[in-house]
Amino acid sequence: MTEARPVATERAYPALSREYPADFRVDDSYKASLPDLQNGPASLIVGARAPIQHVGISNFRLPIRYQTQEGGEIALETSVTGTVSLEADRKGINMSRIMRSFYAHAEKQFSMGVLEAALEDYKSDLGSFDARIMMRLSYPMRVESLRSGLSGWQYYDIALELSERAGQRLRIMHFDYVYSSTCPCSLELAEHARQMRGQLATPHSQRSIARISVVMQGDTLWFEDMVTLCRRAVATETQVMVKREDEQAFAELNAANPIFVEDAVRAFAAELMAEPRIGDFRVVASHQESLHSHDAVSVLTQGETFAHASLDPAIFAGLRA
């Protein structure tokens, strides 16, 4: 005969309030009693006791004020990613400190000096050796049409990156430039059909994009400077406001500047090499073909900063013109 199990009583589990205590106030003593697992002992580490190069938060958004090259100011929604290194014998980090450190500087007008101060703060707050901040924004510039006199806003996707590793600090700008590329081969074939057979034919062209990453050195490299540099390299930037005369002008501009993807990355590289405010760089270009069901792509790097034996699998997938 089995023994009867004891009947559970209400005292086995405390009665819990199911109402939110809006009037509850936290004092220092209560805060000191709160558990903090991320700062726990190394015995709590899960998995390999290995150092982590990047741990933090991604895509917290806030408005940041930027100065234009002409001296004006513009507030733009900015997405921020902040990470630090973590030593092998440390359990984790308090990620909210990254946000708090950044917010302490968020009301200031942006400059690389402000960004460096934010980096120093959260590196110090978290007791880390290495740290990185990346800010992503879309920067508007008014662009004139080619012939009609109209103008419209062109937006440039930009990421600013400040990183410190082993005491070496890098200031990097990633800049997306969208342009039209007319295939030189297709242009010649279309002309051949016209001349040899009186056959109307049109060359194929496509929206294309270059992501240009540069190490900034020396004097300020303005966003507007990058736009000017890219336009010198590849003149066929996509248009904003267009009337018929602008569309015709753009067709003429493309015919005057046919370009393969290999030509494009080298044209950008020539301008980047000539700019003393730019050190190492990388150009990733994608011509999103209208003839083929695939894209034509190319990568050109200068210096060690962006040189890798392996390509990120998403390096071209992330380029959507």
Swiss-Prot record:
Q: Which key words are in the record?
A: Hydrolase
Entry annotated with the keyword Hydrolase:
yes
| InterPro entries, alphabetized | GTP_cyclohydrolase_FolE2, GTP_cyclohydrolase_FolE2/MptA
| A Pfam family hit | GCHY-1
Presence of keyword Thylakoid:
no
Pathway listed: Cofactor biosynthesis; 7,8-dihydroneopterin triphosphate biosynthesis; 7,8-dihydroneopterin triphosphate from GTP: step 1/1
GO molecular function, a single term: GTP cyclohydrolase I activity
Q: Spell out the reaction equation it catalyses.
A: GTP + H2O = 7,8-dihydroneopterin 3'-triphosphate + formate + H(+)
| Domain of life assignment | Bacteria
E.C. number: 3.5.4.16
According to its UniProt entry, one GO biological process term is: tetrahydrofolate biosynthetic process
- Site positions for May be catalytically important: 183
| Family indicated by similarity | Belongs to the GTP cyclohydrolase IV family.
Give the HAMAP family listed for this entry: GTP_cyclohydrol_B
Free-text function comment from the UniProt entry? Converts GTP to 7,8-dihydroneopterin triphosphate.
What is the name of this protein?
A: GTP cyclohydrolase FolE2
Q: Provide the taxonomic classification.
A: Bacteria, Pseudomonadati, Pseudomonadota, Alphaproteobacteria, Rhodobacterales
